[in-house]
Amino acid sequence: MQAIILGSAAGGGVPQWNCRCPICAMAWAGDRRVLPRTQSSLAVSPDGERWLLVNASPDIRQQLLATPALHPRHGLRHTPIEAVLLTNGDVDHVAGLLTLRESQPFRLHATRNILESVSANRVFDVLAADLVARREVGLNETFEPVSGLAVTLFPVPGKVPLWLEEGTPEIGAETETTVGAMIEAGGRRLAYVPGCARVTEDLRHRLAGVDALLFDGTVLADDDMIRAGVGTKTGWRMGHVPMTGQGGSIAALAEVPIGRRIFVHINNTNPVLVENSEARRAVEAAGWDVGHDGMALRL
């Protein structure tokens, strides 16, 4: 199984288009300690020829250009992407579907709740129904979006997408709204969880024994955005568990047997984005890698 992290940042990327927080300012200045990053997306293949796209980032065209394995290969129209899978309905995970509208057949897989959020906005009807089949997937139901690639979706604590919030949203519920994906091929397992509000015992049990985990790295501490002076929301309010602190993902998963541990979906205010910073060194010392655009895994 092969996997490529197409986009490693949270919504808005790094640097964000209008942001001059300390980290974005470094990126705008070309400081090599802060790599530019596009928004969250992953490509997975059982053989390097046929690919599953997990989440369609607003930056998908840029990501495809940067990834030769995903370039058209023959004929007038072609893509090695056979299917797209959504783990939630967030803008940074669905907006890229609009870029994939150019008369190209593929299958779109998601839970009923996530598909309904897409169907609720008629702009996504540009994906012609006769070309893009929408396939509903049940939780804990194993299916093959690409032949040879077995996928099981499972609930993780989360919340509804920001654009669907009404009043005060329920945060941390385990429903079809936010899911993780267990992807298996050739006896190897990769877990992709780009959004998670907290680490539960059920999640710890499910992740035990995976060969690689790509996990929500949105915030280092719950108050990252507040400290940076660019927002008032905590990680919890956004539906994202912090890396550090009591209940943080590093501590919560420390005793779980996991092969490679990689943080993805990293917000522009997260100090781990600065190479060789105290935060980066601490995360790496705990056994985690900080994912970057173009990072490739072979399992």
Swiss-Prot record:
Keywords: PQQ biosynthesis, Transport
Pathways per UniProt: Cofactor biosynthesis; pyrroloquinoline quinone biosynthesis
Pfam families per UniProt: Lactamase_B_2
Origin: domain of life: Bacteria
BP term (GO), one: pyrroloquinoline quinone biosynthetic process
Keyword set includes Transport: yes
Coiled-coil intervals: none
Role, per record: May be involved in the transport of PQQ or its precursor to the periplasm.
Family that this chain belongs to: Belongs to the PqqB family.
Name of protein: Coenzyme PQQ synthesis protein B
